[in-house]
Design a protein with these regions (language model features):
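N-terminal secretory signal peptides that target proteins for export/translocation
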Residues: 1-4
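The canonical Cys-X-X-Cys-His
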Residues: 32-42, 91, 95
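Electrostatic cytochrome c docking/interface patches
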Residues: 15-31, 43-46
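Sequence context surrounding c-type heme c attachment/ligation sites in exported
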Residues: 26-37, 64, 85
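Internal catalytic or translocation cores that form aromatic/hydrophobic pockets or channels
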Residues: 80-90, 94-95
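Bacterial N-terminal signal peptides
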Residues: 6-16
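Gly/Gly-Pro-rich "capping" loops immediately C-terminal to redox-active cysteine motifs
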Residues: 29, 45-81
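Flexible coil segments in periplasmic/lumen-exposed cytochrome c-class electron-transfer proteins
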Residues: 86, 97-151
Length: 151
Protein backbone atom coordinates (compact mmCIF):
# COMPACT_ATOMS: atom_id res chain seq x y z
CA UNK A 1 0.00 0.00 0.00
CA UNK A 2 2.77 2.57 0.78
CA UNK A 3 4.34 1.81 -2.58
CA UNK A 4 1.02 2.47 -4.32
CA UNK A 5 0.67 5.83 -2.56
CA UNK A 6 4.22 6.79 -3.48
CA UNK A 7 3.57 5.91 -7.11
CA UNK A 8 0.33 7.90 -7.06
CA UNK A 9 2.17 10.97 -5.78
CA UNK A 10 4.90 10.60 -8.39
CA UNK A 11 2.36 10.22 -11.19
CA UNK A 12 0.44 13.25 -9.93
CA UNK A 13 3.62 15.38 -9.93
CA UNK A 14 4.84 14.24 -13.33
CA UNK A 15 2.89 16.77 -15.48
CA UNK A 16 4.13 19.73 -13.41
CA UNK A 17 7.69 18.45 -13.58
CA UNK A 18 7.52 17.98 -17.33
CA UNK A 19 5.96 21.41 -17.84
CA UNK A 20 8.72 23.09 -15.84
CA UNK A 21 11.43 21.21 -17.72
CA UNK A 22 9.83 22.03 -21.08
CA UNK A 23 9.86 25.82 -20.62
CA UNK A 24 12.18 27.33 -23.22
CA UNK A 25 14.93 29.69 -22.22
CA UNK A 26 14.37 33.03 -23.89
CA UNK A 27 17.21 35.10 -25.25
CA UNK A 28 18.03 38.42 -23.57
CA UNK A 29 16.78 40.19 -26.71
CA UNK A 30 13.45 38.36 -26.51
CA UNK A 31 13.12 39.12 -22.80
CA UNK A 32 13.85 42.79 -23.57
CA UNK A 33 11.06 42.82 -26.14
CA UNK A 34 8.64 41.05 -23.80
CA UNK A 35 9.51 42.88 -20.58
CA UNK A 36 11.04 46.26 -21.49
CA UNK A 37 10.10 47.40 -25.00
CA UNK A 38 6.52 48.16 -24.01
CA UNK A 39 7.79 51.23 -22.16
CA UNK A 40 11.31 51.86 -23.47
CA UNK A 41 10.49 50.97 -27.08
CA UNK A 42 12.37 48.78 -29.52
CA UNK A 43 14.99 51.49 -29.97
CA UNK A 44 15.40 52.18 -26.23
CA UNK A 45 14.19 55.76 -26.63
CA UNK A 46 11.45 55.72 -23.98
CA UNK A 47 8.62 58.22 -24.31
CA UNK A 48 8.11 61.77 -23.17
CA UNK A 49 4.37 61.15 -22.82
CA UNK A 50 4.93 58.11 -20.61
CA UNK A 51 7.75 59.74 -18.63
CA UNK A 52 10.06 56.87 -19.58
CA UNK A 53 13.72 57.87 -19.97
CA UNK A 54 15.79 56.96 -23.01
CA UNK A 55 18.71 54.53 -22.77
CA UNK A 56 21.16 56.08 -25.28
CA UNK A 57 23.64 58.50 -23.70
CA UNK A 58 22.44 57.53 -20.21
CA UNK A 59 22.32 53.87 -19.28
CA UNK A 60 26.06 53.30 -19.74
CA UNK A 61 26.86 56.15 -17.37
CA UNK A 62 24.26 55.03 -14.85
CA UNK A 63 25.65 51.49 -14.91
CA UNK A 64 29.12 52.94 -14.38
CA UNK A 65 28.43 53.92 -10.77
CA UNK A 66 27.66 51.88 -7.69
CA UNK A 67 24.50 53.90 -6.97
CA UNK A 68 23.42 53.60 -10.59
CA UNK A 69 23.80 49.85 -10.66
CA UNK A 70 21.66 49.51 -7.54
CA UNK A 71 19.09 51.91 -9.01
CA UNK A 72 18.83 49.80 -12.17
CA UNK A 73 17.83 46.77 -10.10
CA UNK A 74 14.95 48.68 -8.50
CA UNK A 75 13.26 50.36 -11.45
CA UNK A 76 9.61 49.27 -11.73
CA UNK A 77 10.13 47.31 -14.93
CA UNK A 78 12.81 45.16 -13.32
CA UNK A 79 10.93 44.72 -10.05
CA UNK A 80 7.75 43.63 -11.84
CA UNK A 81 9.36 41.69 -14.69
CA UNK A 82 8.95 38.17 -13.24
CA UNK A 83 12.44 37.39 -14.57
CA UNK A 84 14.88 35.57 -12.33
CA UNK A 85 18.19 37.17 -11.35
CA UNK A 86 20.14 35.42 -14.12
CA UNK A 87 17.65 36.62 -16.74
CA UNK A 88 17.72 40.15 -15.32
CA UNK A 89 21.53 40.18 -15.57
CA UNK A 90 21.29 38.98 -19.18
CA UNK A 91 18.71 41.64 -20.13
CA UNK A 92 20.70 44.39 -18.41
CA UNK A 93 23.83 43.29 -20.27
CA UNK A 94 21.86 43.28 -23.53
CA UNK A 95 20.72 46.86 -22.80
CA UNK A 96 24.31 47.88 -22.03
CA UNK A 97 25.62 46.17 -25.18
CA UNK A 98 23.09 47.97 -27.36
CA UNK A 99 22.77 51.41 -25.68
CA UNK A 100 25.47 51.59 -23.03
CA UNK A 101 28.18 53.41 -24.96
CA UNK A 102 29.79 56.36 -23.18
CA UNK A 103 32.10 59.08 -24.49
CA UNK A 104 35.12 57.14 -23.25
CA UNK A 105 34.02 54.14 -25.27
CA UNK A 106 34.68 51.95 -22.25
CA UNK A 107 31.87 49.46 -21.76
CA UNK A 108 30.14 49.20 -18.42
CA UNK A 109 31.04 46.20 -16.32
CA UNK A 110 28.59 43.40 -17.12
CA UNK A 111 26.08 42.42 -14.47
CA UNK A 112 26.36 38.98 -12.93
CA UNK A 113 23.58 36.94 -11.41
CA UNK A 114 25.21 37.29 -7.98
CA UNK A 115 25.41 41.07 -8.30
CA UNK A 116 21.76 41.28 -9.33
CA UNK A 117 20.76 39.15 -6.34
CA UNK A 118 22.80 41.33 -3.97
CA UNK A 119 21.61 44.66 -5.35
CA UNK A 120 17.96 43.61 -5.46
CA UNK A 121 18.22 42.75 -1.76
CA UNK A 122 19.36 46.30 -0.93
CA UNK A 123 16.47 48.44 0.32
CA UNK A 124 15.44 51.28 -2.01
CA UNK A 125 12.18 52.60 -0.55
CA UNK A 126 11.78 55.47 -3.07
CA UNK A 127 13.20 54.73 -6.51
CA UNK A 128 12.48 58.26 -7.79
CA UNK A 129 14.45 59.85 -4.94
CA UNK A 130 17.18 57.28 -5.48
CA UNK A 131 17.42 58.20 -9.16
CA UNK A 132 17.90 61.83 -8.12
CA UNK A 133 20.92 60.71 -6.07
CA UNK A 134 22.29 58.89 -9.11
CA UNK A 135 21.75 61.93 -11.36
CA UNK A 136 23.34 64.27 -8.79
CA UNK A 137 26.38 61.98 -8.52
CA UNK A 138 26.74 61.88 -12.30
CA UNK A 139 26.29 65.67 -12.55
CA UNK A 140 29.19 66.12 -10.13
CA UNK A 141 31.24 64.04 -12.58
CA UNK A 142 30.12 66.29 -15.46
CA UNK A 143 27.71 63.75 -16.93
CA UNK A 144 24.15 64.65 -17.91
CA UNK A 145 21.76 61.76 -18.41
CA UNK A 146 18.32 61.55 -20.01
CA UNK A 147 15.64 63.70 -18.48
CA UNK A 148 13.50 62.05 -15.88
CA UNK A 149 10.25 64.00 -15.59
CA UNK A 150 8.99 62.42 -12.38
CA UNK A 151 8.58 64.92 -9.54
Amino acid sequence: MPLLRSLSVLIALLPATLAAADQPTRSPHTNYILRCAGCHGFEGLGTTEGDIPAFPDSVGYIAGTDLGRTYMMHVPGVVGSSLNDREIAEVMNYVLDVWGETESGAPAVPFTEDEVTRRRAEPVPDVVAYRRLVVDELAEMGVKVADYPWP
